[in-house]
């Protein structure tokens, strides 16, 4: 704990204020550490209580957000409501259980940041990520207010608890997406700085073997932090969040295809619900450019002229090791968190949406036959 660290992400330690972890940043010691207090523990208990109450409320009564005029749609809608609390509880539990690993990750990242003399505060993406999270919170606040007026007509306790759970889920899940995305951006920026340093080293007339070796060790350290440490902390979190996010997108697309939901007001409402969901579903995938950044190091080394010294063997060993590199970031091994997953993701969403529509058509056909 004696290593001085830079504050990598100015919003990362806000996890403690949202009841996710005890992560804190000491301004006097300049380190990330776990600082459990009665207030942080109380917030965590309240958050767990909210989701447990929302889950019990949804189990007590077969609720659905919107009447889909079909048993299939209502059943899936109810499943989405149940998944809201379950997946968020699991995501929170995962992050809470990995909080020590997160501190270790931040300390090691800080050491690499110091080594490469990288300035996190100079990266504008971090501020934009945080501002977008705040904006989405405001959008959902307005949407829930509009939706709640119609949904809470009878003020049933189960509906109130379910709606509160949904609001908490939107705030916490999107913040977890934001934290993960920010960490990926840091890794990507560190690789960019490392590539520039390597480019400078190999462009000199006399290439320093010790300098190149140190640069390649830094490269491996950055990739290792992503493949092991970052995924250990956030891999399970992203997996659980994706499950609900995909189900919610399927439900919204399904509702948009129902009769009576094609007015301009309905389309605007559907878009406002869908846009933030899709944004945070896509964001962790498109921001990951780590593999391409890592390949730049390999491409640069292939252009280094052979000298017949130990430098050649070191470069060949490095290139051989990175020849068949697996996806660097994954949802704990279930799928890659990069652009290659985008097509599969949207294919799955539209496939399951079509299946729901087909079940609804079969249900309507059965009802028509029974009338005769």
Curated annotation (Swiss-Prot):
Keyword Transmembrane helix: yes
GO cellular component, one term: axon
Principal location: membrane
Recorded phenotype for the gene knockout or disruption: Leads to reduced courtship levels toward females.
Segments traversing the membrane: 33-53, 60-80, 123-143, 148-168, 225-245, 266-286, 349-368
Cytoplasmic topology ranges: 1-32, 81-122, 169-224, 287-348
Extracellular side: 54-59, 144-147, 246-265, 369
GO biological process: chemosensory behavior; male courtship behavior; sensory perception of taste; signal transduction
InterPro entries according to UniProt: 7TM_chemorcpt
GO function terms (MF aspect): taste receptor activity
Tissue: Expressed in the adult labellar chemosensory neurons. In larvae, is expressed in neurons of the terminal external chemosensory organ, as well as in the dorsal and posterior pharyngeal sense organs.
Subcellular location: Cell membrane
Bilayer disposition of the protein: Multi-pass membrane protein
Record keywords, A-Z: Cell membrane, Membrane, Receptor, Transducer, Transmembrane, Transmembrane helix
Family per similarity comment: Belongs to the insect chemoreceptor superfamily. Gustatory receptor (GR) family. Gr21a subfamily.
Protein's job: Gustatory receptor which mediates acceptance or avoidance behavior, depending on its substrates. Plays a role in sustaining courtship behavior in males, possibly through the reception of a stimulating arrestant pheromone.
Annotated protein name in UniProt: Gustatory and pheromone receptor 39a, isoform B
Annotated source species: Drosophila melanogaster (Fruit fly)
């Amino acid at each position: 704990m004696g290593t001085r660290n830079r504050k990598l992400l100015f919003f990362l330690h806000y996890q403690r204020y949202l009841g996710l972890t005890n992560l804190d940043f000491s301004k006097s010691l300049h380190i990330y550490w776990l600082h459990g207090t009665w207030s942080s523990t109380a917030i965590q208990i309240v958050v767990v209580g909210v989701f447990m109450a929302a889950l019990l409320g949804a189990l007590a009564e077969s609720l659905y957000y919107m009447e889909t005029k079909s048993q299939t749609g209502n059943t899936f809608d109810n499943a989405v409501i149940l998944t809201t609390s379950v997946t968020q509880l699991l995501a929170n539990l995962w992050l809470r259980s990995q909080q020590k690993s997160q501190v270790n990750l931040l300390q090691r990242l800080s050491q690499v940041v110091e080594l490469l003399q990288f300035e996190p505060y100079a990266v504008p993406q971090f501020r934009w990520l945080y501002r977008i999270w705040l904006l989405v919170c405001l959008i959902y606040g307005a949407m829930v207010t509009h939706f709640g007026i119609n949904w809470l007509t009878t003020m049933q306790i189960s509906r109130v608890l379910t709606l509160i759970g949904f609001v908490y889920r939107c705030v916490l899940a999107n913040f977890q997406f934001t934290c993960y995305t920010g960490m990926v951006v840091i890794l990507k920026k560190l690789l960019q700085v490392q590539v520039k340093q390597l480019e400078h080293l190999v462009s000199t007339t006399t290439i320093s073997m010790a300098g190149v070796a140190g640069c390649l060790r830094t490269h491996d350290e950055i990739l290792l932090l992503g493949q092991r440490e970052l995924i250990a902390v956030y891999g399970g979190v992203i997996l659980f969040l994706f499950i609900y996010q995909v189900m919610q997108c399927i439900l919204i697309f399904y509702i948009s295809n129902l009769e009576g939901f094609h007015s301009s007001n309905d389309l605007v409402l559907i878009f406002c619900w869908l846009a933030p969901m899709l944004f945070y579903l896509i964001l962790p995938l498109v921001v990951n450019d780590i593999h391409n950044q890592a390949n730049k190091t390999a491409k640069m080394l292939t252009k280094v002229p052979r000298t017949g010294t130990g430098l050649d063997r070191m470069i060949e060993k490095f290139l051989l090791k990175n020849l068949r590199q697996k996806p660097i970031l994954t949802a704990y091994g279930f799928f890659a968190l990069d652009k290659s997953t985008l097509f599969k993701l949207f294919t799955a969403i539209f496939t399951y949406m079509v299946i729901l529509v087909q079940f609804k058509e079969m249900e309507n056909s059965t009802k028509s036959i029974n009338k005769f």
